[in-house]
Amino acid sequence: LKKIDSVQVDARTVNDVKVSKDGKICVISREGASSRKNGIILIDVTNPKEVKIISEYTKNLTGGVHNVFIDKNHIYALSNAERYYVINIDDPKNPKEVGMFELDKEGQSIHDVWIENGIAYSSNWSDGVYLVDVGNGVAGGSPSNPVSFGNYSYASGAHHATFPYKSKSTGKFYTVLGDEIFPNGVNPKGTNETAGFLHFVDFSDVNNPIEVARYELPGHGSHNYWIEDDILYVAMYTGGLRIVDLSGDLLGDLYKQGREIGYLLTGT
């Protein structure tokens, strides 16, 4: 691997980076900007060797943006962990807010949003995952009029990320929900104990979603993950990177079934 270019922005933390499917536009999140405006930055990555900042967008995002998602001509940006705004980028030099989604309840919080086939999967901690129509048509929603139509939550209240996944081997569709738990709190100067696992949920009946399987690595909690060609790649904090075979029907405890096919302990 070799670095071929870079950009420098005013931020204490860039927590998320997403690139459009056509590979032309990158959006990054900002927290802790000295200007206190935070927001997002759009970058032209058409030529990865000569990347250029196109614009920044800060309206309603000054509290900090932890996660973003880019889908076609819209960006979905979390605002201060309370809601997400939908921003049109038909003209990336002049982004425009067109919509917003939040739960209509006191104390709600959001950690992540992922869009697939016109559905936004909103990860809302103790409130679980919300399925929101932002253009699919299943509930009459659009980017400018997000409409919630499904929800699943569970006892730990630690839902922080969602990955919609269709099995190549069976054609079945799963909504994979990840926990993020620190049983003894967070020590920024040391190694932390983590817990939690991945929940595989069948939303075939949106009014009665069913959790059918899990991947739980004893002694370690989950964080980010990716699924490709029925292979799960999941970061498990001190448990390193775990690689899991998801082919065939998914039922029960996938770890105990011996589906793990590889791992990399990145901290050693």
What name fits each language-model region?
Residues 1-268:
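Feature marking well-ordered beta-strand scaffolds used for ligand recognition
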